[in-house]
């Protein structure tokens, strides 16, 4: 418009009308809440700003019991049935980055392996720890090794009260909050919407019992990036689980309800892809913590976050931008 003759009113009017055409609503009715709706409050609005060039930001985490410390607060799942080359490449990447794995079988030596235990996958004594579905918890955990890290996978809000009570009474180390039922069936991650409300609901349930620090919370479902990880850690998770994002980095291609792997990728290329993704996500999560004035990723808290949609405020228990609180009574 700046280059148009200012006296040419018809042309200016036509150009303006084109620019004023209504666009599609980015938040239509029924839109599912997303982690993209969450924003971090910059440190200069809430506290003293750290010097990102001089002050390091630690991101390592211990899941509990005597498990080795994870260099990155990440776990990976969903690779039990992929081609052998993909498994080996993933194992090498996990060794390089210090990331753990959740699955029925070990895919590499010298990694934190949390074994998925069910009717067809008995506990392996070489596993770092075990996770069982809530439906099998009472049966499987009565015979577990009491000195091993043990967790319960829960995916439905109506199960959480009983699961939390059982976990506290049985000295369970962790609750795996499976927001898409993807720990047991990776294909669900392509067909279901993530239930981010599992995390704030569990934190609230533990807080009511004054047991918030007694159980490690690990969230799985819809995690794509380091920013997603930082937001979930701020909401109360100690670690997050990647599935589809890592599969794509390893050469996977989404095919409706499954992921197929390109056959022209070498093992080195797959390893490099997964390693780059995990390291980039670690740096991104650290960056978000630094922006909020924290020198440790796990010092992030819900007060560092705001959301920009009412549906996300309701689901995630985070205040809407411009407000101070949110009513959690409607959750569940």
Features from the language model and the residues they span:
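A structural signal for short, well-ordered beta-strand segments and their strand-loop junctions
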Residues: 101-103, 241, 299
């Amino acid at each position: 418009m700046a280059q148009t003759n200012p006296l040419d009113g018809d042309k200016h009017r036509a150009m303006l009308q084109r620019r004023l055409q209504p666009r599609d609503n980015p938040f239509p009715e029924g839109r599912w809440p997303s982690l993209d709706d969450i924003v971090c409050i910059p440190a200069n609005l809430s506290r003293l700003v750290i010097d990102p060039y001089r002050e390091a930001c630690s991101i390592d985490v211990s899941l509990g019991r005597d498990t080795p410390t994870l260099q990155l607060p990440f776990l990976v799942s969903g690779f039990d049935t992929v081609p052998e080359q993909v498994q080996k490449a993933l194992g090498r990447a996990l060794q390089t980055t210090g990331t753990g794995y959740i699955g029925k079988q070990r895919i590499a030596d010298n990694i934190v392996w949390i074994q998925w235990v069910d009717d067809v996958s008995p506990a392996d004594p070489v596993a770092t720890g075990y996770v069982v579905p809530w439906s099998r918890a009472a049966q499987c955990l009565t015979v577990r090794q009491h000195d091993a890290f043990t967790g319960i996978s829960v995916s439905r809000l109506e199960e959480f009260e009983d699961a939390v009570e059982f976990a506290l009474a049985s000295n369970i180390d962790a609750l795996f909050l499976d927001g898409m039922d993807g720990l047991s069936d990776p294909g669900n991650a392509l067909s279901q919407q993530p239930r981010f409300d599992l995390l704030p609901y569990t934190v609230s349930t533990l807080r009511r019992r004054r047991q918030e620090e007694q159980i490690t919370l690990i969230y799985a479902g819809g995690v794509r990036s380091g920013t997603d990880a930082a937001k979930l850690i701020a909401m109360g998770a100690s670690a997050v689980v990647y599935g589809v994002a890592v599969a794509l980095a390893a050469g996977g291609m989404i095919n409706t309800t499954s992921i197929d792997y390109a056959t022209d990728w070498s093992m080195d290329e797959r390893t490099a892809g997964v390693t780059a993704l995990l390291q980039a996500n670690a740096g991104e999560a650290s960056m978000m913590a630094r922006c909020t004035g924290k020198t440790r990723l796990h010092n992030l808290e819900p007060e560092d976050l705001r959301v920009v949609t009412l549906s996300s405020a309701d689901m995630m228990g985070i205040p809407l931008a411009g407000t101070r609180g949110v009513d959690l009574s409607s959750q569940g």
